[in-house]
């Protein structure tokens, strides 16, 4: 019986590769089941706002289930990159780009998503209540067509938001017009973008609500903006969400240099070099 079973996986036997693939998929599935965990939340219990949010929402019911082919961080990254490229090819998203000139000569911008089925990009002030505005601050890549940004964009658009992706210096074919590139401390650039949108597209009667969302590096920049501006930020945005905020830049840098044979930092470095050459 044992010999018969082993013969099924003998190199050159019928459907050998199919059998190997089947075993691989089964093993991956078993690992994802093993890695499935209930989310745990660690927060200051004296924070009444967070305590109320935890109590009223269903966020504590969320369960982390790894994707079948993403049983490790590296596999997750590779699967994500493949999915992102497929999304760009088969379901590309178009944008209405608006550029903003900064006081020091630098250039930032906003990629406004078109409303579904229309060519309506940038918001328009109206005499009646209009769509709430949601500005997205992406991560290290800084592009508006990253899959994690696009997925949120589409979900928010279905919920009735006008979506714009903030583009910091040097991002996604923006012209480099000063001697400064974007970095984790670029909160003043974030401030300039938010105040530009507030002044240009939000009426003085505040018929439109305006929110900001930051992911990874974008979350770090947005958080620093709110810390530095304090209550003044509340006059510009009506709310903000930070996701995947890097709490230690030095540890994050070590991760890029030391993990996956340095592939992460090489990829980012190549992309940055290409952007500068353009």
Q: What positions do the PLM features span?
A:
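Terminal signal-anchor or tail-anchor transmembrane helices
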Residues: 2-38
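N-terminal cap/lid segment of alpha/beta-hydrolase-fold proteins
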Residues: 73-127
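Alpha/beta-hydrolase-fold enzymes
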Residues: 27-52, 199-278
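Intrinsic disorder
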Residues: 94, 104, 128-131, 143-147, ...
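N-terminal topogenic membrane-targeting module
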Residues: 36-74
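Catalytic nucleophile-loop/oxyanion-hole region of alpha/beta-hydrolase
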Residues: 146, 169-211
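Short, surface-exposed "cap/lid" segments of acyl-processing enzymes
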Residues: 113-177, 196
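Core residues of folded domains in eukaryotic genome-function proteins
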Residues: 96, 104-108, 130-133, 159-164, ...
């Amino acid at each position: 019986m044992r010999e018969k079973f082993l013969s099924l996986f003998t190199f050159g036997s019928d459907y050998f590769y199919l059998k190997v693939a089947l075993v691989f998929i089964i093993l991956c599935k078993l690992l994802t089941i093993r890695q499935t965990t209930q989310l745990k939340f660690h927060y200051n219990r004296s924070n009444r706002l967070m305590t109320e949010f935890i109590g009223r929402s269903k966020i504590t019911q969320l369960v982390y289930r790894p994707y079948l082919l993403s049983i490790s961080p590296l596999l997750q990254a590779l699967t994500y990159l493949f999915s992102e490229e497929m999304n760009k090819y088969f379901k590309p998203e178009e944008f209405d780009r608006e550029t903003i000139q900064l006081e020091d000569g630098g250039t930032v911008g906003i990629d406004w998503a078109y409303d579904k089925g229309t060519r309506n990009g940038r918001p328009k002030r109206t005499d009646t209540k209009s769509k709430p505005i949601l500005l997205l601050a992406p991560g290290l890549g800084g592009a508006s067509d990253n899959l994690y940004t696009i997925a949120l964009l589409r979900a928010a658009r279905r919920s009735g938001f006008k979506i714009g992706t903030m583009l910091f210096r040097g991002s996604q074919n923006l012209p480099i017009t000063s001697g400064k590139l974007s970095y984790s401390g670029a909160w003043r650039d974030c401030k300039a973008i938010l105040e530009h949108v507030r002044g240009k597209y939000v009426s003085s009667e505040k018929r439109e609500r305006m929110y900001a969302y930051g992911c990874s590096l974008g979350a770090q920049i947005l958080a620093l903006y709110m810390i530095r501006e304090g209550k003044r930020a509340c006059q510009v945005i009506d709310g903000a969400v930070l996701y995947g905020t890097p709490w230690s830049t030095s540890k994050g840098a070590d991760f890029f240099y030391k993990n996956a044979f340095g592939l992460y930092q090489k990829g980012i470095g190549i992309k940055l070099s290409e952007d500068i050459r353009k």
